[in-house]
Amino acid sequence: MLGFRSPIRLCKLSALGSAPLLPISRPKLFSTAVARYAADMETVNTTERLARLRQLMQEHKVDVYIVPSEDSHQSEYIAPCDGRREFISGFSGSAGTAIVSMTKAALSTDGRYFNQASKQLDSNWELLKRGVENVPTWQEWTTEQAEGGKVVGVDPSLITASGARSLEETLKRNGSSLVGISQNLVDLVWGKDRPAPPREKVRVHPDKFAGKTFQEKIADLRKELEKKKTAGFVISMLDEIAWLFNLRGSDIPYNPVFFAYAIITPTKAELYIDDDKITPEVVAHLGQDVVIKPYNSIFADAKALSEARKQEAGETASKFLLSNKASWALSLSLGGEEHVEETRSPIADAKAIKNEVELAGMRACHIRDGAALIEYFAWLENELVNKKTVLDEVDAADKLERIRTKHDLFAGLSFDTISSTGPNGAVIHYKPEKGTCSIIDPDAIYLCDSGAQYLDGTTDVTRTFHFGKPTELEKKAFTLVLKGLIAIDTAVFPKGTSGFALDALARQYLWKEGLDYLHGTGHGIGSYLNVHEGPIGIGTRVQYTEVPIAPGNVISDEPGFYEDGKFGIRIENVIMAREVQTTHKFGDKPWLGFEHVTMAPIGRNLIQPSLLSDLELKWVNDYHAEVWDKTHHFFENDEFTRSWLQRETAPITK
């Protein structure tokens, strides 16, 4: 699935001599209990909503109001009740910030969503294309609107402490100010139509899948806190809490997390969660090691904890550790910048390095998931080509989900399946909706980006097929993308190398043609957790320079190419970083490489063998032989699918 983006300028393709436009993505059921939460691409009339919001802004003496995408835990993907930015703007993409002044409104988003936002925003809104030359950032636009001593308001629980400080400093320079408004104004506009917060039960994630008890994880965390000489760690990121306590939930579609906070000190472990989500199994699991407290008491408790610490030790009191992604509201409750140490979360770092049990689970679940994909693509080709069945993009995506449910340890989808035909493949984060989506054209490129949650791991795979006769242009573009995927897969690099440094390997063959793609090359992946997981990744984000790739990291490898209005190409495998043996060891340091775990054929009729080196062609044939070896036993009683797999994994020659 497409992860994080790169600030690259858009351009058109002409006979593979210029450059491309956007990529794609579509969300789906996290479990059968979760209804689809997606809007179609139609424009939403926001006139009345904006009028009501501006009335509330006047009442609260605010001239400009910021509406972030995130929830109180800074989640990338959110529950329906937290879709405030979508409600006020009509834009349903996962990333973006809305800003409303008394006379104007703007929506800032990145290159994955330019196409979508331009279709969904009505005439009340200005689209700020992030990363495009001469287009202001949302902070710059806000500052301009606030000139002359105006007041900018924001819900302090929805913006990071560092983000608030940075904006506050910028506003001060032109005589303006930033204020936190605890009552969210968009919620007031939304009123009774706002979806209710989720109330799903929390589940224990067994140690046989986690590979480590939660007591061991907390002990390791306390060692880190001792090294940093901090008073404790206040945790707000949902996937970090789920990972730390070996618990899973269903509060956010596709992400097995639950709304909670936690505080870990040298002597206490406290979990803040609504009582109605706790089962006897969870109580028994946590035992005497964890105190369960009400979710809404976190801010009062954090304030009391900070004040008690100051009274005991005065000005020499050690600070509380807080993630640099934690909210402004949480930072203020701990006494603000002077009393907290904001840093990259030590839990994020630990979670990103999978243990041997988690790595084994990743290998196993990707083989089962590969079998599901093989059955699906064999079925799809047969329906489209042989039976001439009329299928739309949602029909196909639903079939894939049904196939996945048959496999062991399946627990839902990891994101909404991106099932896209022809030009829809060139739309970043494309969302097909029943009634408005396209009929799949067997004579056009079909791009499918999908993933699943299994109790032993999380999958994310993209395959691009053509069930007819692809053009030479399509084959050349596909092969250039494939060469980039192979370059990452076969990379060998010294310990300490970042994903930022590796990114160019995937783009080099497109760059030689003057081409590129508007998204990162890879993102971290959780173990039965979020399909997008930091802090590691492969791309041009500054954050990727901060954390080097390490053994145990699980990352996607997904270069692409997109010709707006025509087709999209992306090939995605999940890879795991590991130590490799090299002839030499320059600098006497370990050297790393990758192990791929995704097991699904790569569209062979789109490959132009003459563009592959001998080593690249060997990689393709070796990979397909591995796919056959690890998956063909699933089809002992399914001769049709077995024959399709045999054909698709047969050796390719020049």
Curated annotation (Swiss-Prot):
Signal peptide: none annotated. PANTHER family: XAA-PRO AMINOPEPTIDASE 1 (PTHR43763:SF6). This is Probable Xaa-Pro aminopeptidase P. Catalyzes the removal of a penultimate prolyl residue from the N-termini of peptides. The keyword Manganese applies. InterPro entries: Creatin/AminoP/Spt16_N, Creatinase/aminopeptidase-like, Creatinase_N, Pept_M24, Pept_M24B, Peptidase_M24_C, Peptidase_M24B_aminopep-P_CS, X-Pro_aminopeptidase_P. Binds 2 manganese ions per subunit. Its cofactor is Mn(2+). GO terms for biological process: proteolysis. It comes from the Eukaryota. SUPFAM superfamilies: Creatinase/aminopeptidase, Creatinase/prolidase N-terminal domain. GO terms for cellular component: cytoplasm. The keyword Hydrolase applies. Pfam families: Creatinase_N, Creatinase_N_2, Peptidase_M24, Peptidase_M24_C. Its EC number is 3.4.11.9. Belongs to the peptidase M24B family. Keywords: Aminopeptidase, Hydrolase, Manganese, Metal-binding, Metalloprotease, Protease. Mn(2+) 1 binds at residues 460, 558, 572. It catalyses: Release of any N-terminal amino acid, including proline, that is linked to proline, even from a dipeptide or tripeptide. Mn(2+) 2 binds at residues 449, 460, 572. GO terms for molecular function: metal ion binding; metalloaminopeptidase activity.
